A protein has these predicted regions:
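Acidic-glycine-rich active-site phosphate/pyrophosphate-binding loop
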Residues: 13-27
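Short amphipathic
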Residues: 4-11
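A short glycine/serine-rich beta->alpha loop
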Residues: 28-38, 66-71, 106
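Active-site His/Glu-centered metal-binding helix of metallohydrolases
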Residues: 43, 47, 51
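Conserved small/polar residues in nucleotide/adenosyl-binding loops
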Residues: 107-112
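A short small-residue
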Residues: 24-31, 60-67, 97-99
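Glycine- and Gly-Pro-enriched alpha-helical subdomains that act as flexible
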Residues: 52-92
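Short glycine-rich, basic-tinged beta-strand/loop micro-motifs
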Residues: 93-105
């Protein structure tokens, strides 16, 4: 019998000037980037959170805190590799990942 576990991950970072935009480990050519302690890759962060949750291993902030010098500007693919290693210590492996990215830029107008 298969032991299937499902996790749900969610992450949000603000778009700002002066940062690179990383999504799913790919650098996108865009004038804004996501603000964060690491590279702020929201897709990878949400995936890490989902994997950790499915394994009942808390969340990404617990394992990779934004107060750690080790995670400052880190490539989120490294966090994903470490997360996969963490869940492997509990006997779990990734069978499938399904992710949806919701993104928008809010524009405001002086007209009311």
């Amino acid at each position: 019998m298969m032991n299937i576990r499902v996790g749900f991950g969610y992450d949000v970072h603000k778009l700002v000037a002066g940062r690179e935009l990383w999504l799913g480990g790919i650098k996108l050519n865009y004038e804004l980037g996501l603000l964060g302690h690491s590279d702020a890759d929201v897709l990878i962060h949400a995936i890490c959170d989902a994997l950790l949750g499915a394994a009942n291993m808390r969340d990404i902030g617990y394992h990779f805190p934004d107060t750690s010098a080790e995670t400052l500007n880190v490539d989120s693919k490294i966090l994903l590799r470490k997360t996969i290693g963490l869940i492997a210590t509990k006997g779990y492996q990734v069978g499938n990942i399904d992710a949806t990215v919701c993104a928008c830029l809010l524009y405001t107008s002086d007209a009311a």
